[in-house]
């Protein structure tokens, strides 16, 4: 089995992206699955082009993309991606799409095909804060999650795919009072446990991970 796991380069004025740094720290094998690590640009369209090129090159069974969500307290596997690009800031090539569809012929939304509740359980049982997220935003993270699931739906039905958001690391919040953070070691361990759950669970578990509002 092969798992393609991607991490974004730094964006939004940050000098580091914990998503990419945590991906780099992952072992090359998890639960007997080969781990293929890929840096992708925080750029609309180009990020998806790079992922698809690596899908074609490596033929992975699972694709997991990792992104930074500053302000979140834990590691949050995403439940759903929506067909909208609505960028509050420019990407790394100064693109700023507003109210545009990711793909004109795509569904309004695609749900993850990863066992996200099993992932959360693995992390929580190891003492790593984690919960299911019901919004991947409308920036490049959602763009990538939606785009990968669109490709899976249209071209690669045997691949499982989804997205995980991670918090800031401590060095990023020195000048951001009261902003939560997590060590890069805990983030990487959480991702390793998430990959383990994805490899070992063909279907998700039934646990309450919903939100009131």
Swiss-Prot record:
User: Which BP terms from GO are recorded?
Assistant: proteolysis
Highest taxon above the source species: Bacteria
Alphabetical keyword list: Cytoplasm, Hydrolase, Protease, Thiol protease
Enzyme class (EC, first level)? hydrolase
Q: Note whether Phosphoprotein occurs among the keywords.
A: no
Q: Where in the cell is it found?
A: Cytoplasm
Question: What biological function has been recorded for the protein in this entry?
Answer: Removes 5-oxoproline from various penultimate amino acid residues except L-proline.
The name under which this protein is listed is: Pyrrolidone-carboxylate peptidase
Biological source species? Clostridium botulinum (strain Alaska E43 / Type E3)
């Amino acid at each position: 089995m092969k798992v393609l796991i991607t991490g974004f380069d730094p964006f939004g004025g940050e000098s580091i992206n914990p998503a990419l740094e945590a991906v780099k720290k992952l072992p090359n094998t998890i639960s007997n699955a080969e781990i293929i690590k890929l840096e992708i640009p925080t750029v609309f369209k180009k990020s998806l082009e790079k992922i698809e090129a690596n899908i074609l090159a490596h033929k992975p069974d699972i694709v997991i993309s990792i992104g930074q969500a500053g302000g979140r307290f834990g590691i949050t596997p995403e439940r759903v991606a929506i067909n909208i690009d609505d960028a509050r800031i420019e990407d790394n090539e100064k693109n700023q799409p507003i109210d545009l569809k990711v793909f004109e012929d795509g569904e309004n939304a695609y749900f993850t095909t990863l066992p996200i509740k099993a992932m959360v359980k693995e992390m929580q049982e190891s003492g790593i804060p984690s919960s299911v997220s019901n919004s991947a935003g409308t920036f490049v993270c959602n763009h990538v999650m939606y785009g990968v699931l669109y490709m899976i739906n249209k071209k690669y039905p045997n691949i499982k795919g989804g997205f995980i958001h991670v918090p800031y690391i401590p060095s990023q919040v020195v000048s951001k009072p009261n902003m939560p953070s997590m060590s890069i070691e805990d983030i990487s361990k959480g991702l390793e446990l998430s990959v383990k759950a994805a490899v070992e669970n063909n279907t998700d578990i039934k646990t309450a991970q919903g939100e009131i509002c």
